[in-house]
Amino acid sequence: MQLYTSAANIPHPDKSHRGGEDGFFLTTPSISSVGIADGVGGWANQNINPKLFADDLMEYTKQSIESGVREPVIALDEAYNMVEQTGSCTAVVGIMERDGLFSVANIGDSGFIVIRQHEILIKSKEQQHGFNFPYQLGKVEGKDGKFYEHGDDRPQDCETYQLKLHEGDIVVFGSDGLFDNIWDNALLEEINSMDCESPEKMANSLAEMAFNEAGRKDNWIPFTERALEQGAWGLKERNDPAFLGGKMDDITVVVAIVV
């Protein structure tokens, strides 16, 4: 079996001049791997392009996998050691073997969902130090020109998953711009309504759906629900009119179909 994949990316309108802050990679079906990284936007306040760290981490992860590494945490660790950029990002990386064994490493608030026979089989969990403070991999440049680990999180802190995929399973990977704006049941309904074998159409449809929800002013989204659950912003009531509206962000979606 192999993963037949396609990606869609819609940058935050205010960040489109630099292509947003997400990075991602796809490999050929014979290698069957996927990765998404979400650059932490706060670095822009220090005149650092957050996308560069995310892009490099994904490129080096792809290179590691293409060289023969088949464990996502090891691939991420090799890539992290190679990055020479100041910045940080969340990341999710998945690899499937020919027998369907699917391994994923996730750090932070990007993630994935597996859909089987029109139902959600599994969804990854976020890793947060606190509300809207996801685990992240980072580095900073020292005065000596070398790059050093930044923050407390490392590839070994990834949440890991392993399961057997079946032919026809659909895996949706996304940055938080997808999962913060789209409820799981709405995502599932959108995928099921398409009933097609085109990951490109599915990825584009989900990205556009998330972007539309992000721009609305009258919706209650998963991100705000988590704020309510965690007591953030002084929020005490669901659908409080003062807190309605989407969360504009970079949106990256990868859809993989098992064939």
What kind of feature is each model-predicted range?
Residues 1-259:
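PP2C/PPM-type serine/threonine phosphatase catalytic domain
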